[in-house]
Design a protein with these regions (language model features):
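Extreme N-terminal leader/targeting segments of oxidoreductases
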Residues: 1-5, 22-24
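Short hydrophobic core segments
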Residues: 5-8, 30, 178-188
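Glycine-rich Rossmann-fold phosphate-binding loop(s) that bind the pyrophosphate
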Residues: 9-11, 15, 32
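Gly/Ala-rich phosphate-binding loop of Rossmann-like dinucleotide-binding domains
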Residues: 18, 22, 145
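Glycine-rich FAD pyrophosphate-binding loop
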Residues: 22-41
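Dinucleotide-binding Rossmann-like beta1-alpha1 core, especially the glycine-rich loop
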Residues: 45-115, 121-123
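A short, glycine/Asx- and small/polar-enriched loop/turn
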Residues: 88, 113-121, 163-170, 178
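Helical element adjacent to the flavin cofactor pocket in flavoenzyme catalytic cores
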Residues: 126-182, 186
Length: 188
């Protein structure tokens, strides 16, 4: 076997998995493009709002918060507005409470986003705790961590075939053949 773990996809999911799995054994990341995080992971305007989303997402966000805060420069202040119409008051009130937003006036909100239409927007919440995520810094940090533990990244490795082979996997790619005990699909 070439590695314990073979990860297909070199975006944030694949590179962060490589960082963690490299603590447990040998890792190879296969990325189809010329560089890691070439697609959405490298271009996203990421928001860290740990109370937003489905319960599983909120749980993951809350569990990740201390780690994100330990990385200098990964998080920076942003703020987030939640806007609502009169007919959506019940859902708005629920979201305001669950996500711990502060209620602000429409006039205050227009001071932040002047194009808000006060004829349409009747309720506003503000979350000063919402932050930007420097995704490039985060991905590069995970990549350094994985590389520091011996993980290898292979770019220009478009996967062309996958086969279960004995107790592991064989992956064919434009960069050659790779084998591993475990296969992780982190491709976008």
């Amino acid at each position: 076997m070439d590695a314990d773990f073979l990860i297909i996809g070199g975006g944030i999911a694949g590179v962060s998995a490589a960082a963690r799995m490299s603590e447990l054994g040998g890792v190879i990341v296969l990325e189809a493009e010329d560089a890691l995080a070439h697609h959405a992971s490298g271009r996203s305007a990421a928001l860290f709002e740990p109370r937003y989303g489905a319960p599983a997402v909120v749980g993951l966000s809350m569990a990740s918060e201390a780690y994100f805060r330990s990385l200098p420069g990964v998080l920076s202040p942003r703020g987030l507005l939640l806007v609502g119409k009169a007919e959506g008051a019940e859902a708005f009130e629920h979201d305001l409470e669950v996500m711990a937003f502060d209620r602000i006036s429409v006039e205050e909100a227009r001071g932040i986003v002047p194009i808000l239409n006060p004829e349409t927007v009747t309720m506003v919440g503000y979350a000063g705790h919402a932050e930007d995520v420097d995704t490039d810094l985060l991905v590069q940090g995970f990549a350094r961590e994985a590389k520091g533990r011996g993980a290898k990244s292979v770019t220009r490795a478009r996967v062309t075939g996958i086969a279960k082979e004995g107790a592991g996997w064989r992956v064919s790619s434009s960069a050659g053949e790779f084998t591993a005990r475990m296969l992780v699909n982190a491709a976008g």
